[in-house]
Amino acid sequence: MSVITTPIETLHLKSTLRLLPRAVYRSQRIQVFPPNIFSNTSLSSPLRIDPISQVGGSRNLWRRYASDNFSEMGLDPGADPFKVIEKPSIVDRMKKANSILPHVVLASTILALIYPPSFTWFTSRYFVPALGFLMFAVGINSNEKDFLEAFKRPKAILLGYVGQYLVKPVLGFIFGLAAVSLFQLPTPIGAGIMLVSCVSGAQLSNYATFLTDPALAPLSIVMTSLSTATAVLVTPMLSLLLIGKKLPVDVKGMISSILQVVIAPIAAGLLLNKLFPKVSNAIRPFLPILSVLDTACCVGAPLALNINSVMSPFGATILLLVTMFHLSAFLAGYFLTGSVFRNAPDAKAMQRTLSYETGMQSSLLALALATKFFQDPLVGIPPAISTVVMSLMGFTLVLIWSKEKSNTF
């Protein structure tokens, strides 16, 4: 059906269409319209506007055709044509900095191997404050509700805890013993592998879970937080049990150090979030990019500082043992969860989450403890290698499982 409009209506329509984009621009918003929408439609309904005559002049009459076909107008039929979106700001982009973390880990590893001086300035004295900053970021992005999530799925929390502080230490003891007995490596190397197995879960496991199964990210945070909070007692005790007969372990010193590096920063972040929400909201957008840079230094520096040991004849053997330890931990967490939650509706997602929790350790904490409480620098080599291996293996699984999920759906 066609309608003949008057010249006055034509002028009004043309002026309206000409002024509308300016009003949109001035409000700093972008309409979700294709570029040619203003020349093809009126404001009230999907209409096609064609001039009757191709002779120039403002007295041309225009025909308006009412149409129900949005596709020929260049619009998505299921979309809201008047939806408004904001232009992403620098702060918004900074909030998403964590999305490049896997690439940053790989890049810092390669850079540390190719040009070690790029990270050697980040000496061992910076490890403790760097790890403390990451813990502070965890605290400021959490609240008491995150910890209360533990009571909703106690069975999963218990299984994650068993994986962290029973399955993993047993694997660490086996591979640490094999390093000394079978591969004839120095005793401090075996002690370093055992130390890695005694620390709490890595915060990167929370992000890995978020990338593959966002719905279980809160559960992952609770499991990691509980293992981190209790590490103040469990890690020194396990270290004494597994390493004490081989090397002296300062239990009191470890407890004090974990309190300062882990518990205090998390508590500070929680308190700041609770008591001064405006301050925490102001600094929260900057934490992802700072955390990524912090993690890059924490991954590259241990590798660069121990480059001679890593590239030594027994460096490949240590790399093999650490890789096998993490691979065994990933597999143990995956299949143990599958046997316990085989009938759960989200069994596969639970398997992936518990696999991350068991396979990814806070190797930075192990490195900080090795640097501070063991005189032999060889103890720090397995944690340094573990930092890189654990990160690369974890995010490789993220890529594999994400692709698997997309193919399933």
Curated annotation (Swiss-Prot):
Cellular component aspect of the GO annotation: chloroplast; chloroplast envelope; membrane
- Topology within the bilayer: Multi-pass membrane protein
Q: Which residues cross the membrane?
A: 100-120, 121-141, 170-190, 191-211, 221-241, 253-273, 285-305, 316-336, 381-401
Location of this chain's protein in the cell: Membrane; Plastid, Chloroplast envelope
Pfam families attached to this UniProt entry: SBF (PF01758)
**Stored InterPro entries:** BilAc:Na_symport/Acr3, Bilac:Na_transpt, Na+/solute_symporter_sf
Q: Which UniProt keywords apply?
A: Chloroplast, Membrane, Plastid, Transit peptide, Transmembrane, Transmembrane helix, Transport
Q: Name one GO molecular function term.
A: glycolate transmembrane transporter activity
Question: Could you point out where the transit peptide sits in the sequence?
Answer: 1-49
Tell me, what does this protein do in biology? Answer: May function as sodium-coupled metabolite transporter across the chloroplast envelope.
Family, per the entry?
Belongs to the bile acid:sodium symporter (BASS) (TC 2.A.28) family.
Q: What is the protein's name according to its record?
A: Probable sodium/metabolite cotransporter BASS6, chloroplastic
Which source organism does the UniProt entry give?
Arabidopsis thaliana (Mouse-ear cress)
